[in-house]
């Protein structure tokens, strides 16, 4: 199948839990990852710590997420593996092409993500209009910057 974009690699893995503090004990204290920033959004019901491993274009984020309000949606702590982020060389072309193939996206379209890159999300479940999905896994498509495109192409 000829597609007008490439998936270059993994940008992030987002892990949800009831407590970022408990998640940090494992990922920072035990595994040795470094916290590089944080992000909070009442609208997205998320309070997250952004960790990293690797360097330069090979850096991968591990996002530790807890809900701002566990009674509201989205429930960023359930499932525990919240989503996976993929570097894309041309996000706009990818969204256009995938939509034509019948892939369902979450509301909101392309927007700035927590790490400052343009992102959009493939819905974990299809529907009648857009039957293709990632079968239960939320997938974030992330516009790769030039250095990542060069290194991973």
Model feature map: region roles:
Residues 1-4, 9-18, 49-54, 72-153:
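Vicinal oxygen chelate
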Residues 1-24, 81-88, 142-153:
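N-terminal beta-strand motif that seeds the catalytic metal site of vicinal oxygen chelate
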Residues 23-28, 98:
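Conserved active-site tyrosine of GNAT-family acetyltransferases
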Residues 28-36, 102-104:
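Conserved acetyl-CoA-binding loop of GNAT-fold acetyltransferases
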Residues 34-76, 115-145:
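Conserved short beta-strand elements that form part of the metal-binding/catalytic scaffold
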């Amino acid at each position: 199948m000829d597609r007008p974009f490439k998936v270059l690699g993994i940008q992030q893995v987002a892990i949800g839990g009831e407590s970022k503090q408990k998640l940090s004990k494992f990922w920072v204290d035990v595994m040795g990852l470094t916290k590089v920033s944080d992000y909070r959004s009442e609208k997205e019901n998320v309070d997250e710590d952004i960790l990293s491993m690797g360097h330069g274009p090979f850096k991968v984020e591990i996002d530790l997420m807890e809900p701002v309000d566990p009674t509201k949606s989205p429930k960023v702590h359930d499932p525990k593996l919240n989503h996976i982020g993929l570097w894309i060389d041309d996000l706009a072309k990818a969204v256009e092409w995938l939509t034509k193939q019948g892939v369902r996206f979450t509301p909101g379209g392309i927007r700035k993500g927590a790490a400052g890159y343009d992102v959009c999300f493939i819905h974990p479940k299809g529907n009648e209009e857009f039957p293709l999905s990632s079968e239960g896994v939320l997938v974030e498509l992330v516009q790769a910057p030039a250095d990542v495109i060069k290194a991973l192409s």
